[in-house]
Amino acid sequence: MKILIDTSYFLPLIKIGIENIPQTILVNLLSKTSHEYFYSNLTIFELTAKGLKLSSQKNTISPQDIRIGIDAIQNDLRLTEKSFIDNPLIIELASQLKVIHSDTIDCLIFATAICVCDCIITMDSSFFDQINKTPSLINKIREINENFRFWFNDLSEDLKGLKSIDS
């Protein structure tokens, strides 16, 4: 299965903890070689932005911590970078997602996952809930990737698909 890993799971690599999630979740996930793992090029931007904010405001992490974390992602042979410009459908779908979700980067990352992978690992269950309340988006996502799945939080629960809608 092709899995896109959302930005939150990479935060420990730049010394930012994730509440209620084991710090080893990414290491444990990547040890499962039966899947292919991807990240969005926007994840690198998001990690840098979050890291610089903490570095400049609280001095809890350093620019070197950010660089080390990004290098770890980019040099890990188990991870493949995907760009939001790799497929023209990504921007089209992101535009439709933007109608229900205000975070443009989230929209682009989710659209990238839907267009080029089988699953997204994310902590953003509210975005999934918003999509599930929008029949036109459910139809569009199914048109692009009929069996796309979402996997949430600590990955202890089963993958979730979009709800069925009557045609």
Sequence positions of predicted segments:
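Acidic, PIN/NYN-like endoribonuclease modules and their adjacent C-terminal/linker elements
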Residues: 115, 119-167
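Short, amphipathic alpha-helical segments that act as regulatory/interfacial helices
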Residues: 48-52, 114
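Helix-adjacent hinge/juxtasegments
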Residues: 58-86
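Short, well-structured N-terminal submotif of metal-dependent ribonuclease cores
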Residues: 1-42, 51-68, 161-167
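Active-site neighborhoods of divalent-metal-dependent phosphate/nucleic-acid chemistry enzymes
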Residues: 78-126, 130
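Ser/Thr-centric signal marking residues that sit
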Residues: 7-8, 43, 112, 122
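A generic structural signal for short hydrophobic patches within well-formed alpha-helices
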Residues: 10, 44-47, 127-128
